[in-house]
């Protein structure tokens, strides 16, 4: 937690050009982050040990079912590493966690794996569960430091209808059951 600056916002704001990176996906392909087929990309930051990400995963996956919407995850450093899922010491460690997320935990979205140094994550502000909506021109049209699926969905529906975004992101904690399961899987820290 000491690595996060909760007082200062970093990363692209609404109206800014979204940073683009060529990254390896959990399936081993190299893809460009902003090369998506639809009108909008919902990009969520996440890791297997982040209770906020884990609690919102199913709802966020369903957003990709909306016509005109692509959805992806930027796999970042572990939010709450423990004895079982440790801080990444190599890119292979990080790739292993991202692969586990897709194969064992069922994440269906494209999972981009950031480098060990977190260059893409830093460019997007370094928050563990931020979300960005990016349009086809590569412009950020919505951002939230903490993902709230209801606000994200409302923003998407506004954008798809050609309206100004009225959704206001706000922090919503994960359910205790998800917190205990996620941290239990990570192991004692």
Residue ranges and their predicted role:
Residues 30-61, 71-75:
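Short active-site neighborhood of thiol/selenol oxidoreductases, capturing the structured segment around
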Residues 54-56, 84-87, 125, 144-145:
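Short, solvent-exposed loop/turn segments at secondary-structure boundaries
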Residues 30, 77-81, 139-140:
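A short, flexible beta-alpha/helix-coil linker loop
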Residues 1-41, 127, 143-189:
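Non-globular targeting/processing and membrane-anchoring segments
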Residues 68-114:
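Conserved segment of the thioredoxin-like fold in thiol-based oxidoreductases
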Residues 105-107, 113-155:
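Thiol/disulfide oxidoreductase modules built on the thioredoxin-like
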Residues 48-50, 78-79, 118, 147-148:
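Short, solvent-exposed loop/turn segments at secondary-structure junctions
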């Amino acid at each position: 937690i000491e690595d996060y600056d909760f007082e200062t916002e970093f990363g692209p704001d609404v109206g800014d050009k979204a940073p683009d990176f060529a990254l390896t996906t959990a399936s081993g392909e190299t893809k460009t982050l902003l090369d998506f087929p639809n009108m909008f990309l919902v990009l969520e930051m996440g890791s297997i040990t982040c209770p906020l990400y884990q609690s919102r995963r199913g709802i966020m996956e369903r957003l990709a079912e909306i016509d005109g919407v692509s959805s992806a995850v930027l796999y970042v450093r572990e939010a709450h590493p423990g004895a079982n899922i440790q801080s990444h010491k190599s890119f292979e460690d990080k790739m292993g966690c991202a692969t586990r997320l897709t194969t064992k935990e069922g994440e269906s979205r494209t999972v981009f794996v950031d480098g060990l140094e977190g260059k893409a994550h830093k460019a997007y502000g370094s928050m563990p569960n931020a979300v960005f909506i990016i349009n086809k021109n590569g412009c950020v049209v919505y951002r939230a430091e903490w993902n709230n699926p209801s606000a994200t969905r409302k923003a998407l529906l506004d954008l798809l209808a050609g309206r100004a975004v009225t959704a206001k992101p706000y922090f919503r904690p994960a359910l205790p059951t998800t917190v205990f399961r996620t941290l239990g899987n990570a192991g004692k820290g």
